Swiss-Prot record:
Residues 1-98 form the Glutaredoxin domain. It comes from Rickettsia bellii (strain RML369-C). GO terms for molecular function: protein-disulfide reductase activity. The gene is grxC1. This is Glutaredoxin 1. InterPro entries: GLR_AS, Glutaredoxin, Glutaredoxin_subgr, GRX_bact, Thioredoxin-like_sf.
């Protein structure tokens, strides 16, 4: 089953990544449900999916955030959307975190 169908917000993270923790903290503050996919190495099948979604870049940074299958970008991009007042609009209608 496609995870994007189950969770409209997907965040690809690395364990211990401070930017990943910061992005998740903002999503938690907004009280929206999201799917976190921890990607530990370039052999992980989730990385292949992510590279395909991002047109196969040579270098990936984390986190990578998708809302309704739209690539938002990373932590700074998420916070920029919030500062601009556009994040709440993107999150309208999203399931609330349990």
């Amino acid at each position: 089953m496609n995870k994007a169908i189950l969770h409209a917000i997907i965040i690809y993270t690395l364990a211990g990544c401070p930017y990943c923790m910061k992005a998740k903290a903002l999503l938690d503050k907004k009280e929206v449900a999201y799917e976190e996919i921890e990607v530990q190495n370039s052999q992980d099948p989730n990385v292949a999916v992510l590279r395909k979604k991002l047109n196969n870049p040579d270098r990936l940074t984390f986190p990578q955030i998708f809302i309704d299958n739209m690539h938002i970008g990373g932590c700074d991009d998420l916070y920029d959307l919030d500062k601009e007042g556009r994040l709440d609009k993107l999150l309208e209608g999203q399931p609330k975190k349990d």
